[in-house]
C-alpha cells in the first residue's frame, strides 16, 4: 500500500476542504491537536487549504503523556500554527470524583467526549467548523469513541488507511518525532493502538485493503496468507462496530394517514 502520487492527493484533499467549507458558509476551522500523526496531517492539510484561518486546540488530560503535548507544540512552532492549550483535566477529575469505580478505559472514553465538548464549544464561540482526524483503519475497526473523537463536521482523511497517513505525513514534512512514535489514542497511561488491538497497522491495513477494496471473503483472506486470528479479529470488529460510523436508525412510522 504505497501512495503513488502524494502531491495529487494533497491537492485533492485541499480542494475537498475548500469546497466543503464554502458550501457550508464557513471560513475558519478548528482541529484538535493530540501530538499524533493523524491530527498533524489534518492540521497541515487545513493550513494548505485556508492558511491562518486554522486554529489548533490542544486538550491534555491528567494522564496525557508529556510527549504528546510537546509534539503538538513542536508542530505548531514549526509551521507557525495558531493554537492554544485548554486542559480537560478539571472535567476529568470531576468525573473521577463522581465515579471512583471507573476503569481507565471508561475514563479515557469520557475524556474523548470532554474534548468533543470543548471543540464544539470553541466552534460555536468562534464560528469555526470542527475538522475530524479519524483515519479509515480506525473507522472500519470501530477504534474510536462514539460522540468523542469520531465527532466532526468534515473529515479529510477518513478514506486513508493508517499506513497511508504515515506516508502522507512524510510528504507534508511532519516532524520525525511524531511519525516515528507508536500510535496511541492517549486514553490512559502506557496505552498504544497496536498493543490494544494486538496487531501492527501494517498487517491490519493490508487485510483491510484486501477485504474492503478487493472484496476478498474470509476464505480468500486466509488463502492469501493472512493469519487466522487477525482475520477473525478484524472481521468481527468491522461487523460489531459498523454502527459507530452510521447515523442512528430512525423508526419509520406506518399508517399515519
From Swiss-Prot:
Residue numbers binding deamido-NAD(+): 113
EC numbers, comma separated: 6.3.1.5
UniProt binding sites for ATP: 32-39, 133, 162, 184
Pathway: Cofactor biosynthesis; NAD(+) biosynthesis; NAD(+) from deamido-NAD(+) (ammonia route): step 1/1
Residues that, per the record, bind Mg(2+): 38, 138
GO biological process: NAD biosynthetic process
Top EC group: ligase
GO CC aspect terms: cytoplasm
Reaction it catalyzes: deamido-NAD(+) + NH4(+) + ATP = AMP + diphosphate + NAD(+) + H(+)
UniProt keyword annotations, A-Z: ATP-binding, Ligase, Magnesium, Metal-binding, NAD, Nucleotide-binding
One of the record's GO molecular function terms: NAD+ synthase (glutamine-hydrolyzing) activity
InterPro entries: NAD/GMP_synthase (IPR022310), NAD_synthase (IPR003694), NH(3)-dep_NAD(+)_synth (IPR022926), Rossmann-like_a/b/a_fold (IPR014729)
Subunit structure: Homodimer.
Record-stated family: Belongs to the NAD synthetase family.
HAMAP family found in the cross-reference section: NadE_ammonia_dep
Function: Catalyzes the ATP-dependent amidation of deamido-NAD to form NAD. Uses ammonia as a nitrogen source.
Name of the protein described by the UniProt record: NH(3)-dependent NAD(+) synthetase
Organism per entry: Wolinella succinogenes (strain ATCC 29543 / DSM 1740 / CCUG 13145 / JCM 31913 / LMG 7466 / NCTC 11488 / FDC 602W)
